Protein backbone atom coordinates (compact mmCIF):
# COMPACT_ATOMS: atom_id res chain seq x y z
CA UNK A 1 0.00 0.00 0.00
CA UNK A 2 1.32 3.42 -0.96
CA UNK A 3 1.86 5.85 1.90
CA UNK A 4 1.35 9.56 1.47
CA UNK A 5 2.72 12.35 3.63
CA UNK A 6 0.17 13.75 6.13
CA UNK A 7 -2.21 10.81 5.70
CA UNK A 8 -4.09 9.97 8.89
CA UNK A 9 -2.42 7.14 10.77
CA UNK A 10 -3.22 4.21 13.02
CA UNK A 11 -1.50 3.53 16.33
CA UNK A 12 -0.59 -0.01 15.26
CA UNK A 13 3.03 -0.27 14.04
CA UNK A 14 1.90 -3.17 11.81
CA UNK A 15 -0.60 -0.84 10.21
CA UNK A 16 -0.90 -2.66 6.87
CA UNK A 17 -1.23 -6.18 8.24
CA UNK A 18 -4.84 -7.30 7.82
CA UNK A 19 -6.67 -9.68 10.15
CA UNK A 20 -10.23 -10.73 9.33
CA UNK A 21 -11.08 -11.05 13.05
CA UNK A 22 -9.90 -7.56 13.96
CA UNK A 23 -11.57 -4.49 12.57
CA UNK A 24 -9.27 -1.93 10.96
CA UNK A 25 -8.91 1.54 12.42
CA UNK A 26 -10.67 3.06 9.42
CA UNK A 27 -13.85 1.19 10.33
CA UNK A 28 -14.26 3.23 13.51
CA UNK A 29 -15.58 6.76 13.68
CA UNK A 30 -13.04 9.58 13.98
CA UNK A 31 -14.33 10.50 17.46
CA UNK A 32 -13.79 6.96 18.73
CA UNK A 33 -10.32 6.80 17.17
CA UNK A 34 -9.32 10.00 18.96
CA UNK A 35 -10.51 8.59 22.29
CA UNK A 36 -8.53 5.42 21.71
CA UNK A 37 -5.32 7.41 21.30
CA UNK A 38 -5.87 9.16 24.62
CA UNK A 39 -6.53 5.90 26.41
CA UNK A 40 -4.09 3.64 24.52
CA UNK A 41 -3.10 0.79 26.81
CA UNK A 42 -2.95 0.73 30.59
CA UNK A 43 0.65 0.30 31.65
CA UNK A 44 1.94 0.27 35.21
CA UNK A 45 4.24 3.26 35.81
CA UNK A 46 7.74 2.75 37.07
CA UNK A 47 8.03 3.08 40.84
CA UNK A 48 9.98 5.96 42.36
CA UNK A 49 9.70 8.02 39.17
CA UNK A 50 9.15 11.60 40.28
CA UNK A 51 7.81 12.45 36.83
CA UNK A 52 4.97 9.95 37.00
CA UNK A 53 1.41 11.21 36.70
CA UNK A 54 0.58 9.84 40.17
CA UNK A 55 3.39 11.79 41.80
CA UNK A 56 2.30 14.94 39.98
CA UNK A 57 -1.24 14.58 41.37
CA UNK A 58 0.11 13.91 44.88
CA UNK A 59 2.32 16.99 44.72
CA UNK A 60 -0.56 19.21 43.61
CA UNK A 61 -2.78 17.81 46.37
CA UNK A 62 -0.10 18.49 48.99
CA UNK A 63 0.16 22.08 47.78
CA UNK A 64 -3.62 22.38 48.00
CA UNK A 65 -3.67 21.13 51.62
CA UNK A 66 -0.73 23.34 52.63
CA UNK A 67 -2.51 26.39 51.27
CA UNK A 68 -5.84 25.40 52.84
CA UNK A 69 -4.34 24.95 56.33
CA UNK A 70 -1.90 27.85 55.97
CA UNK A 71 1.09 25.59 56.59
CA UNK A 72 3.50 27.65 54.51
CA UNK A 73 4.26 31.25 53.76
CA UNK A 74 3.38 31.75 50.09
CA UNK A 75 5.22 35.06 49.77
CA UNK A 76 8.44 33.71 51.23
CA UNK A 77 8.40 30.53 49.18
CA UNK A 78 7.57 32.38 45.98
CA UNK A 79 10.42 34.83 46.46
CA UNK A 80 12.86 31.96 47.05
CA UNK A 81 11.47 30.20 43.99
CA UNK A 82 12.04 33.27 41.85
CA UNK A 83 15.63 33.57 43.06
CA UNK A 84 16.39 29.91 42.29
CA UNK A 85 14.53 29.75 38.98
CA UNK A 86 16.90 29.24 36.06
CA UNK A 87 14.59 30.78 33.46
CA UNK A 88 11.62 33.19 33.46
CA UNK A 89 8.29 31.43 33.42
CA UNK A 90 4.57 31.85 34.09
CA UNK A 91 3.61 28.21 34.79
CA UNK A 92 0.20 26.73 34.14
CA UNK A 93 -2.07 25.99 37.08
CA UNK A 94 -3.68 22.90 35.55
CA UNK A 95 -2.70 20.23 33.06
CA UNK A 96 -3.52 20.76 29.37
CA UNK A 97 -1.13 18.50 27.47
CA UNK A 98 -3.10 15.96 25.46
CA UNK A 99 -3.17 14.58 21.94
CA UNK A 100 -5.22 16.69 19.53
CA UNK A 101 -7.25 15.64 16.52
CA UNK A 102 -4.44 14.78 14.15
CA UNK A 103 -2.05 11.82 13.99
CA UNK A 104 -0.48 12.02 10.56
CA UNK A 105 1.99 9.97 8.55
CA UNK A 106 5.62 10.91 7.80
CA UNK A 107 6.84 8.19 5.42
CA UNK A 108 10.62 7.55 5.49
CA UNK A 109 11.21 10.05 8.33
CA UNK A 110 12.78 7.29 10.44
CA UNK A 111 15.59 7.03 7.87
CA UNK A 112 16.49 10.73 8.06
CA UNK A 113 19.92 11.44 9.54
CA UNK A 114 19.10 14.99 10.61
CA UNK A 115 15.86 15.59 12.54
CA UNK A 116 14.78 19.12 11.57
CA UNK A 117 12.58 18.27 8.61
CA UNK A 118 9.40 19.74 10.13
CA UNK A 119 8.34 23.37 10.59
CA UNK A 120 5.19 25.45 11.24
CA UNK A 121 4.77 28.82 9.50
CA UNK A 122 3.07 31.89 10.95
CA UNK A 123 0.08 31.35 8.62
CA UNK A 124 -0.66 27.96 10.28
CA UNK A 125 0.93 25.80 7.63
CA UNK A 126 2.98 22.71 8.47
CA UNK A 127 5.76 21.59 6.14
CA UNK A 128 7.44 18.18 6.12
CA UNK A 129 10.50 17.66 3.94
CA UNK A 130 11.06 14.02 2.96
CA UNK A 131 13.52 12.98 0.29
CA UNK A 132 13.84 15.64 -2.39
CA UNK A 133 10.27 16.94 -1.97
CA UNK A 134 8.36 18.84 0.69
CA UNK A 135 4.67 18.74 1.53
CA UNK A 136 2.51 21.50 3.05
CA UNK A 137 -0.48 20.80 5.28
CA UNK A 138 -2.98 23.40 6.50
CA UNK A 139 -4.04 23.27 10.13
CA UNK A 140 -7.16 25.33 9.36
CA UNK A 141 -8.49 23.08 6.59
CA UNK A 142 -6.91 19.89 8.00
CA UNK A 143 -5.76 18.95 4.52
CA UNK A 144 -2.75 18.73 2.24
CA UNK A 145 -2.57 21.96 0.24
CA UNK A 146 0.63 21.77 -1.78
CA UNK A 147 4.07 20.41 -2.37
CA UNK A 148 7.37 21.39 -3.92
CA UNK A 149 10.65 19.89 -5.02
CA UNK A 150 14.34 20.52 -4.44
CA UNK A 151 17.16 19.60 -6.79
CA UNK A 152 18.78 17.30 -4.22
CA UNK A 153 17.71 15.39 -1.12
CA UNK A 154 16.54 17.75 1.65
CA UNK A 155 18.39 17.58 4.99
CA UNK A 156 16.60 20.42 6.89
CA UNK A 157 13.97 23.12 6.38
CA UNK A 158 12.87 26.37 8.03
CA UNK A 159 10.23 29.03 7.33
CA UNK A 160 11.29 32.65 7.65
CA UNK A 161 9.52 34.60 10.46
CA UNK A 162 7.24 36.33 7.93
CA UNK A 163 6.08 33.05 6.41
CA UNK A 164 7.01 34.18 2.90
CA UNK A 165 10.10 32.06 2.26
CA UNK A 166 11.15 28.49 2.98
CA UNK A 167 14.85 27.70 3.35
CA UNK A 168 15.89 24.17 2.38
CA UNK A 169 19.27 22.68 3.22
CA UNK A 170 20.07 19.94 0.72
CA UNK A 171 22.69 17.49 -0.39
CA UNK A 172 25.61 18.61 -2.62
CA UNK A 173 26.36 21.76 -0.55
CA UNK A 174 23.26 23.52 -1.90
CA UNK A 175 20.88 25.79 0.00
CA UNK A 176 17.61 26.70 -1.74
CA UNK A 177 15.12 29.48 -0.98
CA UNK A 178 11.55 28.76 -2.08
CA UNK A 179 8.58 31.08 -2.38
CA UNK A 180 6.03 29.76 0.11
CA UNK A 181 2.90 30.73 -1.81
CA UNK A 182 4.16 29.32 -5.14
CA UNK A 183 6.22 26.41 -3.72
CA UNK A 184 8.98 27.16 -6.21
CA UNK A 185 12.69 27.89 -5.92
CA UNK A 186 13.51 31.56 -6.39
CA UNK A 187 17.19 31.63 -5.36
CA UNK A 188 19.99 29.40 -4.13
CA UNK A 189 23.60 29.40 -2.97
CA UNK A 190 26.25 26.91 -1.92
CA UNK A 191 28.57 26.32 1.00
CA UNK A 192 32.22 27.29 0.45
CA UNK A 193 33.64 24.00 1.77
CA UNK A 194 34.52 22.79 -1.73
CA UNK A 195 36.31 26.01 -2.66
CA UNK A 196 38.15 26.54 0.63
CA UNK A 197 38.61 23.07 2.14
CA UNK A 198 38.24 20.99 -1.05
CA UNK A 199 35.40 19.02 0.53
CA UNK A 200 31.88 18.31 -0.71
CA UNK A 201 29.25 18.72 2.01
CA UNK A 202 25.51 18.81 2.72
CA UNK A 203 23.55 21.62 4.38
CA UNK A 204 22.39 20.01 7.64
CA UNK A 205 20.98 22.90 9.73
CA UNK A 206 19.37 26.27 9.03
CA UNK A 207 17.86 29.11 11.07
CA UNK A 208 16.58 32.64 10.34
CA UNK A 209 17.30 35.85 12.21
CA UNK A 210 14.29 37.24 14.16
CA UNK A 211 13.44 39.73 11.41
CA UNK A 212 13.95 37.33 8.53
CA UNK A 213 16.52 39.60 6.87
CA UNK A 214 19.32 37.06 7.20
CA UNK A 215 19.78 33.39 7.97
CA UNK A 216 22.45 30.88 8.97
CA UNK A 217 23.31 27.47 7.58
CA UNK A 218 25.50 24.68 8.94
CA UNK A 219 26.98 21.83 6.91
CA UNK A 220 28.19 18.25 7.30
CA UNK A 221 31.78 19.49 7.03
CA UNK A 222 31.50 21.44 10.29
CA UNK A 223 31.24 24.91 8.72
CA UNK A 224 28.70 27.69 9.31
CA UNK A 225 27.63 30.35 6.81
CA UNK A 226 25.56 33.52 7.18
CA UNK A 227 23.47 34.77 4.26
CA UNK A 228 21.28 37.77 3.49
CA UNK A 229 17.58 37.26 2.76
CA UNK A 230 18.49 37.15 -0.93
CA UNK A 231 20.89 34.25 -0.23
CA UNK A 232 23.99 36.42 -0.68
CA UNK A 233 27.04 35.38 1.32
CA UNK A 234 27.84 37.43 4.44
CA UNK A 235 30.41 35.28 6.22
CA UNK A 236 31.76 31.71 6.29
CA UNK A 237 33.62 29.94 9.08
CA UNK A 238 34.87 26.39 9.58
CA UNK A 239 34.36 25.37 13.22
CA UNK A 240 34.58 21.61 13.86
CA UNK A 241 35.18 18.31 12.08
CA UNK A 242 31.75 16.85 12.85
CA UNK A 243 28.53 17.65 11.02
CA UNK A 244 26.61 20.64 12.37
CA UNK A 245 23.48 19.37 14.13
CA UNK A 246 21.72 22.56 15.31
CA UNK A 247 22.13 26.31 14.87
CA UNK A 248 20.04 29.01 16.57
CA UNK A 249 20.08 32.80 16.13
CA UNK A 250 19.38 34.64 19.40
CA UNK A 251 16.19 36.73 19.84
CA UNK A 252 18.27 39.94 19.84
CA UNK A 253 20.03 38.96 16.59
CA UNK A 254 23.48 39.29 18.17
CA UNK A 255 24.55 35.68 18.71
CA UNK A 256 24.52 32.36 16.87
CA UNK A 257 24.58 29.15 18.93
CA UNK A 258 26.06 26.10 17.22
CA UNK A 259 26.46 22.44 18.17
CA UNK A 260 27.59 19.42 16.16
CA UNK A 261 26.65 15.75 16.14
CA UNK A 262 28.02 13.53 18.92
CA UNK A 263 29.99 16.32 20.59
CA UNK A 264 30.14 17.92 24.02
CA UNK A 265 30.75 21.40 22.62
CA UNK A 266 28.44 24.40 22.18
CA UNK A 267 29.87 27.42 20.37
CA UNK A 268 28.61 30.98 20.58
CA UNK A 269 29.41 33.22 17.61
CA UNK A 270 28.66 36.87 16.94
CA UNK A 271 25.91 37.37 14.36
CA UNK A 272 26.23 37.70 11.43
CA UNK A 273 30.04 38.10 11.30
CA UNK A 274 30.52 34.62 12.86
CA UNK A 275 33.42 35.68 15.06
CA UNK A 276 34.08 33.41 18.03
CA UNK A 277 32.52 34.83 21.21
CA UNK A 278 32.44 32.00 23.77
CA UNK A 279 32.03 28.24 24.16
CA UNK A 280 30.99 25.46 26.54
CA UNK A 281 33.04 22.26 26.55
CA UNK A 282 31.51 19.69 28.89
CA UNK A 283 31.60 15.97 29.60
CA UNK A 284 28.08 15.59 28.25
CA UNK A 285 26.67 14.68 24.87
CA UNK A 286 24.80 17.76 23.61
CA UNK A 287 21.36 16.90 22.22
CA UNK A 288 19.43 20.18 22.00
CA UNK A 289 19.83 23.97 22.15
CA UNK A 290 17.15 26.70 22.21
CA UNK A 291 16.95 30.39 23.13
CA UNK A 292 14.45 31.64 25.69
CA UNK A 293 11.98 33.90 23.82
CA UNK A 294 11.57 36.35 26.72
CA UNK A 295 15.24 37.21 27.14
CA UNK A 296 17.70 38.85 24.80
CA UNK A 297 20.21 35.99 24.89
CA UNK A 298 19.48 33.19 27.38
CA UNK A 299 20.42 29.85 25.81
CA UNK A 300 19.09 26.51 27.01
CA UNK A 301 21.35 23.51 26.43
CA UNK A 302 20.05 19.93 26.75
CA UNK A 303 22.48 17.05 27.19
CA UNK A 304 22.94 13.48 28.39
CA UNK A 305 25.79 12.20 30.57
CA UNK A 306 27.66 8.91 30.12
CA UNK A 307 25.55 7.29 32.86
CA UNK A 308 22.33 8.33 31.08
CA UNK A 309 21.44 11.29 33.29
CA UNK A 310 19.66 14.09 31.45
CA UNK A 311 20.99 17.58 32.18
CA UNK A 312 20.13 21.11 31.15
CA UNK A 313 22.26 24.24 31.31
CA UNK A 314 21.17 27.87 31.07
CA UNK A 315 23.80 30.08 29.45
CA UNK A 316 23.50 33.87 29.72
CA UNK A 317 25.38 34.96 26.62
CA UNK A 318 26.16 38.61 27.55
CA UNK A 319 27.59 37.71 30.98
CA UNK A 320 28.84 34.22 29.94
CA UNK A 321 27.33 32.81 33.14
CA UNK A 322 26.36 29.12 33.01
CA UNK A 323 24.09 27.31 35.48
CA UNK A 324 23.35 23.61 35.03
CA UNK A 325 21.32 20.97 36.80
CA UNK A 326 20.19 17.35 36.47
CA UNK A 327 16.71 16.65 35.11
CA UNK A 328 14.56 13.67 36.04
CA UNK A 329 15.60 10.13 37.01
CA UNK A 330 18.49 8.26 35.42
CA UNK A 331 17.86 6.20 32.33
CA UNK A 332 16.09 8.95 30.38
CA UNK A 333 17.77 10.41 27.30
CA UNK A 334 16.90 13.97 26.31
CA UNK A 335 16.21 14.23 22.58
CA UNK A 336 14.62 17.64 22.06
CA UNK A 337 13.68 20.77 24.02
CA UNK A 338 11.75 23.99 23.43
CA UNK A 339 10.74 27.06 25.41
CA UNK A 340 7.11 28.12 25.06
CA UNK A 341 6.80 31.71 23.86
CA UNK A 342 3.39 31.89 25.58
CA UNK A 343 4.33 30.74 29.09
CA UNK A 344 8.13 30.47 29.19
CA UNK A 345 7.81 26.81 30.22
CA UNK A 346 10.42 24.31 29.07
CA UNK A 347 9.19 21.31 27.06
CA UNK A 348 11.39 18.21 26.94
CA UNK A 349 11.09 15.01 24.95
CA UNK A 350 12.58 12.13 26.95
CA UNK A 351 13.31 8.58 25.87
CA UNK A 352 14.04 5.55 28.06
CA UNK A 353 16.25 3.08 26.19
CA UNK A 354 15.52 0.14 28.54
CA UNK A 355 11.80 0.33 27.71
CA UNK A 356 12.25 0.63 23.95
CA UNK A 357 11.87 -3.13 23.43
CA UNK A 358 8.67 -3.41 25.46
CA UNK A 359 5.29 -3.91 23.83
CA UNK A 360 3.27 -1.79 23.94
CA UNK A 361 5.84 1.00 23.81
CA UNK A 362 6.20 2.99 27.04
CA UNK A 363 9.62 4.48 26.41
CA UNK A 364 8.82 8.15 25.66
CA UNK A 365 7.56 11.12 27.65
CA UNK A 366 6.77 14.74 26.94
CA UNK A 367 7.52 16.79 30.05
CA UNK A 368 6.66 20.44 30.77
CA UNK A 369 8.81 22.13 33.44
CA UNK A 370 8.51 25.50 35.15
CA UNK A 371 11.91 24.93 36.79
CA UNK A 372 14.27 21.93 37.05
CA UNK A 373 12.43 20.53 40.09
CA UNK A 374 8.84 21.29 39.11
CA UNK A 375 6.95 19.36 36.46
CA UNK A 376 3.67 21.11 35.68
CA UNK A 377 2.47 18.78 32.92
CA UNK A 378 3.43 15.54 31.20
CA UNK A 379 2.26 12.91 28.73
CA UNK A 380 3.58 9.39 28.46
CA UNK A 381 3.83 7.94 31.96
CA UNK A 382 1.25 5.17 32.28
CA UNK A 383 0.45 5.37 28.55
CA UNK A 384 1.78 3.69 25.45
CA UNK A 385 1.99 4.25 21.74
CA UNK A 386 4.33 7.28 21.72
CA UNK A 387 7.67 6.50 20.11
CA UNK A 388 10.90 8.47 20.39
CA UNK A 389 10.33 12.15 19.58
CA UNK A 390 13.13 13.53 17.38
CA UNK A 391 11.94 17.10 16.89
CA UNK A 392 9.20 19.46 18.11
CA UNK A 393 7.72 22.74 16.90
CA UNK A 394 5.06 25.09 18.31
CA UNK A 395 2.14 26.52 16.37
CA UNK A 396 2.20 30.31 15.80
CA UNK A 397 -0.21 30.98 18.68
CA UNK A 398 1.61 28.58 21.01
CA UNK A 399 -1.47 26.46 21.79
CA UNK A 400 -0.43 23.41 19.74
CA UNK A 401 2.74 21.34 19.69
CA UNK A 402 3.80 19.19 16.73
CA UNK A 403 6.14 16.25 17.27
CA UNK A 404 7.83 13.96 14.74
CA UNK A 405 8.73 10.47 15.99
CA UNK A 406 10.94 7.60 14.87
CA UNK A 407 7.75 5.62 14.23
CA UNK A 408 7.06 8.14 11.43
CA UNK A 409 4.18 9.76 13.30
CA UNK A 410 3.39 13.46 13.16
CA UNK A 411 1.35 14.07 16.29
CA UNK A 412 -0.36 17.39 17.06
CA UNK A 413 -0.78 18.04 20.79
CA UNK A 414 -2.98 20.43 22.74
CA UNK A 415 -0.43 22.44 24.71
CA UNK A 416 -2.57 25.34 25.97
CA UNK A 417 -6.27 26.17 25.67
CA UNK A 418 -7.14 28.24 22.63
CA UNK A 419 -7.81 31.90 23.33
CA UNK A 420 -9.19 34.22 20.68
CA UNK A 421 -8.03 37.29 22.57
CA UNK A 422 -4.80 38.84 21.35
CA UNK A 423 -2.08 38.57 23.97
CA UNK A 424 1.40 39.96 24.24
CA UNK A 425 3.42 36.74 24.04
CA UNK A 426 6.97 38.08 23.79
CA UNK A 427 8.97 40.58 25.80
CA UNK A 428 10.08 42.89 23.01
CA UNK A 429 11.94 45.40 25.18
CA UNK A 430 15.00 43.16 25.33
CA UNK A 431 15.40 42.79 21.58
CA UNK A 432 13.77 45.85 20.01
CA UNK A 433 16.99 47.81 19.39
CA UNK A 434 19.07 44.91 18.01
CA UNK A 435 16.22 43.85 15.75
CA UNK A 436 15.85 47.42 14.57
CA UNK A 437 19.54 47.40 13.60
CA UNK A 438 19.13 44.01 11.96
CA UNK A 439 16.17 45.33 10.00
CA UNK A 440 17.95 48.50 8.91
CA UNK A 441 21.20 46.80 7.91
CA UNK A 442 19.60 43.80 6.12
CA UNK A 443 21.26 41.33 8.42
CA UNK A 444 24.49 43.21 9.12
CA UNK A 445 25.19 44.49 12.62
CA UNK A 446 27.50 47.43 13.22
CA UNK A 447 29.19 47.36 16.62
Curated annotation (Swiss-Prot):
InterPro entries: Cdc20/Fizzy, WD40/YVTN_repeat-like_dom_sf, WD40_repeat_dom_sf, WD40_rpt. GO terms for cellular component: anaphase-promoting complex; cytoplasm. It is found in: Cytoplasm. Coiled coil: none annotated. The keyword Cytoplasm applies. GO terms for molecular function: anaphase-promoting complex binding; ubiquitin ligase activator activity. Keywords: Cytoplasm, Repeat, WD repeat. The keyword Cytoplasm applies. A motif (D-box) lies at residues 384-395. It comes from the Eukaryota. Belongs to the WD repeat CORT family. Controls wing pigmentation patterning by regulating scale cell development, thereby playing a key role in mimicry and crypsis. Probably acts as an activator of the anaphase promoting complex/cyclosome (APC/C) that promotes the ubiquitin ligase activity and substrate specificity of the APC/C. This is Protein cortex. It comes from Heliconius melpomene (Postman butterfly).
Amino acid sequence: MDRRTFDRKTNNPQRYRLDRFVATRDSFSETRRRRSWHAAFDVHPVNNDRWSEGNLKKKNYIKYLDKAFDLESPDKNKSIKRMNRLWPCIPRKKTYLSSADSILDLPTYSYAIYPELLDWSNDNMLVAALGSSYHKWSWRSQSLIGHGFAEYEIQCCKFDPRGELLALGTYMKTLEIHNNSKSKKIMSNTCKCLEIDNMNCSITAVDWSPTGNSFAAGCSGGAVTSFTRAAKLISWRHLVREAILLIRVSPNARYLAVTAMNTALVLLLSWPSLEMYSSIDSDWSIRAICWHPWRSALLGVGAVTDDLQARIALWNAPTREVRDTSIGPKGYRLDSMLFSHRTGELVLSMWHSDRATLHPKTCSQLVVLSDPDTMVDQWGEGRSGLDRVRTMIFSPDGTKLATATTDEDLIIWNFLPEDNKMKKTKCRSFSALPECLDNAMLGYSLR
